[in-house]
Amino acid sequence: QYEGRLLFDMMKLSYEDMTCWYYVIELVLALYPVGQKEDEAYDILMAAARAAEERNPRVIAFIASIKLLAAAGYDPTEAIEDPTALSEGARDLLCRFRGYRWGSPFEGSISRALFTECARYLDQFLSNVCDTEMKTAGAFL
């Protein structure tokens, strides 16, 4: 809820989709100090909440995670050290997620296999690059 307006009703989400949003919450708690003002992260969360009203909440939560990481200085699209870690299609999808403009249509389709590959990569990225073990790891799989 924001300024008396319900952004989207998380209680209507499936268990799997809600777990993805818990992932976003856990990510924010891991990356951003409590009580410290962080306008970019706030803007990402607000835009994601608005977008989740009308679009796939699981995909929106994943896009928000990518954007939050980049805003915190951990851009998963730039830090692909091992080019074999992701297929070309998954790398392209990850870059399209990173560049997505809230409120605009998403360019192209999202294959389940490529999305799953990106989700596995994100969990590894958080563990290896950010030194963060997520309790909700695997939420997007």
Each model region followed by its residue ranges:
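Non-catalytic alpha-helical scaffolds and adjoining flexible linkers that form interface surfaces
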Residues: Q1-L141
